[in-house]
A protein has these predicted regions:
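C-terminal motif of bacterial Sec signal peptides marking the signal peptidase cleavage site
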Residues: 16-19
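Sec-dependent N-terminal signal peptides
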Residues: 7-14
Length: 267
């Protein structure tokens, strides 16, 4: 009996270790990349960072291939693959560190997430959904310095640890139900204003059906609900009410919409 118990214990430990390695591989690891907590009074600034990253090439591509509704001309990106690859190589050649300001880190990680997502679609185009690709968020497709991160690693291992819920409305997963892809690059000099705009636009868009008593929200508020529990709140209502044109009652019924994973492509 003791031998069986010991074997059982070993199996449990082995399973736990294996699960942890899978968890890391599943896109939750930051691969040691630096993160900083965003202060409550975040301001946009380029003056307090050891590095100022040039995102102008990405800005030019976005203005050319993304419309104001956030729909993407992936055929156009495919034609401009060289310019896109040059920008990706620039980002990947950099190694963020603690001397970077929180503003530069936010802009860098948001842009690299969005740019590599576009590149992933272009690589597999034509497709109907990002979910048609094997492991889009779990494979190490994003080289940063000597490391290779997954898109999930950037989102879960870095951006979500920065104590900034608004990142959920800045990163784009190439799908209809995602917050729209801005047709401008995020920059340290405008980061706070850009995050505010992205958050307000998404909450007041048709991705959410907001009313005082019965509200149907994007699944983002279900999947990442704890990220929106700020100032001691235990639900998402208070956070949404900061931005919503319609105030939700504290005891309102909250439901969540099905997510549309169809490609956010210009028609």
């Amino acid at each position: 009996m003791k031998i069986l118990v010991k074997i059982f214990s070993i199996l449990i430990v082995s399973t736990f270790i294996y699960s942890c390695s899978l968890f890391s591989a599943a896109g939750l690891s930051s691969q040691g990349q630096p993160t900083k907590e965003v202060p409550a009074n975040l301001t946009s600034s380029t003056a307090i960072s050891a590095v100022n990253v040039d995102h102008s090439a990405w800005d030019k591509l976005l203005k050319k291939h993304v419309n104001k509704e956030g729909f993407v001309d992936y055929k156009g990106f495919k034609e401009d693959r060289l310019e896109l690859n040059n920008y990706l190589e620039l980002l990947s050649s950099l190694e963020p560190n603690d001397n970077w300001s929180v503003q530069e880190l936010l802009a860098y990680y948001i842009n690299i997430y969005n740019a590599y997502t576009v590149d992933l679609i272009v690589e597999n185009y034509p497709i109907k959904s990002i979910k048609d690709i094997n492991g889009p968020w779990t494979k190490g497709i994003v080289p940063i310095g000597k490391n290779k991160l997954s898109l999930g690693g950037i989102e879960n291992g870095i951006l979500r640890k920065m104590n900034e819920p608004r990142i959920h409305f800045a990163i784009n997963c190439a799908s209809i139900s995602c917050p729209r892809l801005f047709n401008e690059a995020y920059t340290a000099g405008k980061i706070n204003e850009q995050l505010e705009k992205a958050t307000s636009e998404f909450i007041n868009s048709d991705q959410n059906d907001v009313s005082p008593n019965n509200t149907k929200l994007s699944s983002i508020f279900d999947w990442y609900k704890k990220d929106f529990f700020v100032n001691g709140e235990t639900n998402v209502i208070a956070y949404i009410n900061k931005y919503s044109n319609t105030t939700i009652d504290a005891d309102a019924n909250i439901d969540y919409k099905d997510y549309n994973w169809n490609l956010n492509e210009q028609k």
